[in-house]
Amino acid sequence: MTDVALPPAALTLPNDSVGVVTPQRMHFQEPLKLRNGSSIAGYDLMVETYGTLNADRSNAVLVCHALNASHHVAGVYADDPRDVGWWDNMVGPGKPLDTNRFFVIGVNNLGSCFGSTGPMSTNPATGEPYGAAFPVVTVEDWVNAQARVADVFGITQFAAVMGGSLGGMQAVAWSLMYPQRLRHCIVVASTPKLSAQNIAFNEVARSSILSDPDFHGGNYYAHGVKPKRGLRVARMIGHITYLSDEDMAEKFGRELKTEDIRFSFDVEFQVESYLRYQGDKFAEYFDANTYLLITRALDYFDPALAYGGDLTRAMAQTQASFLVASFTTDWRFAPNRSRELVKALLDNKRPVSYAEIDAPHGHDAFLLDDPRYHNLMRAYYDRIAEEIGA
């Protein structure tokens, strides 16, 4: 279990923070069979927990992360109090996912670059980093690995599995692969599968990495370099899809970086400066091989594929109650994609609540502190708490 410590004397945190947290490294020796037919053994998963697991282990909530996030869902680290968890506004004492009532688990997925076994890890067969030799992983593989984490805690059924974007896909996969192991499935700003346009954006991003001279076929670690140029462009492309046109107009408009145009190809507009800043920052902390793996996992997710593309038939296996939420200006995973999932659930007479939230911030709205959005989540978790007596 993650240690939750008192903050250092010099560090003052809000009363609704989970405080200073320490992640736990879980080691699993038993091979994990992957969807591609291979397996991986002797792997690690980074885990953080918040709150207290009750006696009957009924108050656990699994939070699944999106592309560039990790197990660090909430709180801060003692050695870097600026590193606040990526969903800190959602998880904590008195917050929508209230850690006074729920035991919350964050798991860093296989293939990531934040401590779980991935391309940067040492391949026991060679003694060198896996690099391009790391197996392609899928959403289903992540869910199977997360189930093993639940087993370690003795959790037979989650009160809820929750996620936004790619995290929402993992929540859907949980409802299909382990239907008896979750009471509620909370899917935010997500989709039952990527559209051709979504896949196209991922392909352009991957191509920018693959064509970077410093990529070296994915084995750039041995060369002491990193394909930062490709990562920068990939992040810039992705970031455009996370924001709405309205939000970009409000933040940047056509504002120039300097007073007058300079008739050059240097940064002229504020929006250019912003994208370059985001790209530079991302290239410093993220791994290119991980980016390739996770975007490909996004592409492959399609639970209806085994049912001839019939999502209604696919969702017939679910037993959980659902909350599905979308945002009006999200064009990466537009509201109609969430409605596809809702329709499939209703066709199967499954209990589902749906909210389409009018918010100007595009796809990234699921990470923001919108009162209507948070009130929705708070009310739904109040309902879950009442069900389980938390």
From Swiss-Prot:
GO terms for biological process: homoserine metabolic process; methionine biosynthetic process. Keywords: Acyltransferase, Amino-acid biosynthesis, Cytoplasm, Methionine biosynthesis, Transferase. The record marks R332 as: Important for acyl-CoA specificity. The active site is at S165, D330, H363. It comes from the Bacteria. It comes from Cupriavidus pinatubonensis (strain JMP 134 / LMG 1197). One of its GO terms (molecular function) is homoserine O-succinyltransferase activity. SUPFAM superfamilies: alpha/beta-Hydrolases. It catalyses: L-homoserine + succinyl-CoA = O-succinyl-L-homoserine + CoA. The gene is metXS. It is an enzyme of class 2 (transferase). Substrate binds at R235, D364. GO terms for cellular component: cytoplasm. Belongs to the AB hydrolase superfamily. MetX family. Transfers a succinyl group from succinyl-CoA to L-homoserine, forming succinyl-L-homoserine. Pathway: Amino-acid biosynthesis; L-methionine biosynthesis via de novo pathway; O-succinyl-L-homoserine from L-homoserine: step 1/1. Homodimer. It is found in: Cytoplasm. Residues 59-369 form the AB hydrolase-1 domain. Its main location: cytoplasm. This is Homoserine O-succinyltransferase.
